[in-house]
Structure formats: structure tokens, C-alpha cells
């Protein structure tokens, strides 16, 4: 089975085309600046790279050109569109309705549109991508894989906020969590590497990209996660504040004469390590570099970043009453030996964790980074959300399922 995986953002589309018999990537790429001047597609097959620069007025336009590349004689994955068996879509928010990946029909589309108010920046472009693929590849099944679904079985004690219950009933205000596809892939892969029974294990997954979150995965289910009603809660991120005292919002509105939207923008776009370094950078590579040179501002930002991560790891060990393994993933998690080492040595040595410096100093390569006598194993596991989406799509189509339960 050949599956095209599509991830539609507001002005970009990431895609991968996979042969699921071998789980090999046939070709992949990125369409960017959709609907704005300078739009282009960067397409790759093996070691070949093609850049197509042409106007793309909307997502349908962009996906039409993507499909042309997928069947291109030289850089495509197949010769004919009929060889695309299914399309898997990343969808950010499934609300409370979707606890697993689903085969898309009109009923599902209505539900996705209904839940768009919970993810107004992300769900609408996801929906545009689905509609476009239905039109461009009529008769080809489409599957939605949700960022929120893996966390949907959290107990109420983990997902409810201590605000008047009527707001949960009226607006479904609760913890949803995000990065679920990544946390699911990394936790499963961690269990495989260590030879653990996934459904009898306690794993903490630490997804550190520009957006960052941690999940407590117990017996194969996410029982808690650091992101909440939106991706703003939890860890200190590139530009997001993570956890703050909620009264700071009203305080800033009053003192600075700001609207709710302006404060929201500050917390989402101007905070995190960007805010802590007074606008220097939101990129942890820049901050690490300066911190290692002795810059006190960047060193403090790195300390705050690592301290918050360590606190969440400690909290989730308590939530699961123990831990078998901790796995780092995503851009920072995979490529920052110093972050992994400092978190484990400065805060988690009480667990009997012993980092193997030689193993830890390798970037982006799947491995155990602790010594053989480390009581708790720590791993570097590169995430692969596209493969997870393709696997779900294949399983749903081959088994004739309407919905996949994790």
C-alpha cells in the first residue's frame, strides 16, 4: 500500500509519500508561502532535490502541484495518481469526539468544522487540505490522525481545570494535550528498544522542539501531558511562556492598556526563551552557544528551560508511581546533548540515572544514552509522526475500520 501523508499549515504543506510494504519514503517535500508572493515547493527523492517556484493561490493549488511531483518521471514516487492508495492527514484538534484516527466522511468533516473553534489557527487549514485531496483524488480514502487523540483517555483528575464546571459543560474547556502522534510513536519505540511490554510500562516522553511538551505514558496510554487547553501551557518554549500565574494576564491588560488578543500574542509569540533573552533568539542552538560562551542572560534562560522540564518529569514520575524510561525527541531533544545531560545530571541523579557521555554526544541517532548500570534508562528517539500517520492510515484501510482505537 502506498500512502501520501499531508500536514497542512496556514501557509505551508509538508508531505511524505511512503510505500507501506517496506515503510520506505518514496519522496517528500514542503510547499511554502501558499497564498503569498514567493510561493515554492522544495521536493526531494533520495539525494535529488527539486525547487519549483510558481504562484499557489490556495491549498488546492499547492496540492495539485505536489501531486504532479509525486508522479513525476524523474523525482516522483509512482508513475500514476491511481497508484496512491490512501491519504493520511495530520489534524491538530479532535476535541472530545475523536479518541483515535478515523476514516474521513462528511460526518467527520462536520465534526472537524465544529471543533475548529478549539484550534482556530490549525484546524481550518487541515480541513482545507482534506477537501482539496478529496477533490483532486476522487475515490481515494482519506484518514485523519489527531494530535489530541493519544491524550484522550487521560483521567478527569488530569484533564479538568479547577474553574467553574459550567465552562467545561458549555465550552469544553479542559486539558487536551498536543504532539500526541509524536508521543505515541516515541513511547512505543522506546518500549521496543528496551524490550518492555508497552502495555505494562511507565515511560516519560520529552518532545522538545520550538513547541515542547512532555507526556506520562503508562501501560500504553497517555495519562497526563504538559500542554493543556491550548499548546501554550506547560514547558518554557521558543516563543511561548508555558505555565504562568493566570492573573498576569489581567495585570498586563490593566497596566499596559492591552487587549486580551494582544496579551495572547505576547504569551504565544514574544515569550519563552525569546522573552527571557530580551528578544535575542527563540532558537535553543543560539542560546546554548551563547550560554557555553559564558553569556549570563542565555545561561539563565537555559537554566529556566531545563528546570521546568525537570519539574514536569518529577511530577510525572509521581503520577505514574515510578518510571522505566525517559525518552527525548524532536529538534532540541534529538540534537542537544547538553540539554539532555544537564537535565539528567542536575535534577534526576536521585533516580540512579547515569549518562554515558560518548553515547549522549551523538546527535539525532536512535540510542540508549545511559550506562548499562543506570537504574532508569534514558533514550534519544527521533520522532517520526509521518510514519505513524501512514501506519494508522494503512491499518484503517486494510482492516476496513471506521476508527482506530489506541
Swiss-Prot record:
<keyword id="KW-0963">Cytoplasm</keyword>
<feature type="binding site">
    <location>
        <position position="385"/>
    </location>
    <ligand>
        <name>Mg(2+)</name>
    </ligand>
</feature>
<dbReference type="GO" id="GO:0006083">
    <property type="term" value="P:acetate metabolic process"/>
</dbReference>
<comment type="function">
    <text>Catalyzes the formation of acetyl phosphate from acetate and ATP. Can also catalyze the reverse reaction.</text>
</comment>
<dbReference type="GO" id="GO:0005524">
    <property type="term" value="F:ATP binding"/>
</dbReference>
<dbReference type="GO" id="GO:0000287">
    <property type="term" value="F:magnesium ion binding"/>
</dbReference>
<protein>
    <recommendedName>
        <fullName>Acetate kinase</fullName>
        <ecNumber>2.7.2.1</ecNumber>
    </recommendedName>
</protein>
<keyword id="KW-0418">Kinase</keyword>
<dbReference type="Pfam" id="PF00871">
    <property type="entry name" value="Acetate_kinase"/>
</dbReference>
<dbReference type="GO" id="GO:0008776">
    <property type="term" value="F:acetate kinase activity"/>
</dbReference>
<feature type="binding site">
    <location>
        <begin position="331"/>
        <end position="335"/>
    </location>
    <ligand>
        <name>ATP</name>
    </ligand>
</feature>
<comment type="subunit">
    <text>Homodimer.</text>
</comment>
<keyword id="KW-0479">Metal-binding</keyword>
<keyword id="KW-0547">Nucleotide-binding</keyword>
<feature type="active site" description="Proton donor/acceptor">
    <location>
        <position position="147"/>
    </location>
</feature>
<feature type="site" description="Transition state stabilizer">
    <location>
        <position position="179"/>
    </location>
</feature>
<dbReference type="GO" id="GO:0005737">
    <property type="term" value="C:cytoplasm"/>
</dbReference>
<keyword id="KW-0067">ATP-binding</keyword>
<comment type="similarity">
    <text>Belongs to the acetokinase family.</text>
</comment>
<keyword id="KW-0808">Transferase</keyword>
<feature type="binding site">
    <location>
        <position position="90"/>
    </location>
    <ligand>
        <name>substrate</name>
    </ligand>
</feature>
<comment type="pathway">
    <text>Metabolic intermediate biosynthesis; acetyl-CoA biosynthesis; acetyl-CoA from acetate: step 1/2.</text>
</comment>
<feature type="binding site">
    <location>
        <begin position="283"/>
        <end position="285"/>
    </location>
    <ligand>
        <name>ATP</name>
    </ligand>
</feature>
<dbReference type="InterPro" id="IPR043129">
    <property type="entry name" value="ATPase_NBD"/>
</dbReference>
<feature type="binding site">
    <location>
        <position position="7"/>
    </location>
    <ligand>
        <name>Mg(2+)</name>
    </ligand>
</feature>
<dbReference type="GO" id="GO:0006085">
    <property type="term" value="P:acetyl-CoA biosynthetic process"/>
</dbReference>
<feature type="binding site">
    <location>
        <position position="14"/>
    </location>
    <ligand>
        <name>ATP</name>
    </ligand>
</feature>
<dbReference type="InterPro" id="IPR004372">
    <property type="entry name" value="Ac/propionate_kinase"/>
</dbReference>
<feature type="site" description="Transition state stabilizer">
    <location>
        <position position="240"/>
    </location>
</feature>
<feature type="binding site">
    <location>
        <begin position="207"/>
        <end position="211"/>
    </location>
    <ligand>
        <name>ATP</name>
    </ligand>
</feature>
<keyword id="KW-0460">Magnesium</keyword>
<dbReference type="InterPro" id="IPR000890">
    <property type="entry name" value="Aliphatic_acid_kin_short-chain"/>
</dbReference>
<dbReference type="InterPro" id="IPR023865">
    <property type="entry name" value="Aliphatic_acid_kinase_CS"/>
</dbReference>
